[in-house]
């Protein structure tokens, strides 16, 4: 799995075009039965998902830190920055999180502002809120 996103904000064709532009040599496929098992693995914390992530060294460190946030938990951008030993790089952490190529699989939606605000979300704040409510970690 190299990419996973949501199409509600930009539409299916625009999302597909974005992936094709980035991954010119890859064959794309809609695979709903596989997606269900991936979603279950993320929600339960059980199961394996073979992923291939491409990013800068800093981005991959941030994305790996996100993989340690269990379903039902939330954290902050500053907590992630501290966990990767870059406590002053909160904005850079936010930028790296915003570039997450595997929405939901790498659970960037579980990161909030220190104030408790939702912050941004690449696929829309409404979707971020809905996922957090579903996971039981957000009541707002």
What are these regions (language model features)?
Residues 1-87, 138-140:
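Basic nucleic-acid-binding alpha-helical/helix-turn surface characteristic of O6-alkylguanine DNA
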Residues 114-140:
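…primarily DNA-binding HTH/wHTH and HhH modules…
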Residues 66, 80, 108-109, 131:
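Residue-level signal for inorganic ion chemistry
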Residues 103-105, 111:
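Extracellular LysM carbohydrate-binding repeats and other cell-envelope/extracellular binding modules
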Residues 61-65, 92, 130:
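Pre-recognition alpha-helix immediately N-terminal to the DNA-recognition helix
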Residues 70, 101, 116:
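Histidine- and aromatic-rich ligand-binding microenvironments
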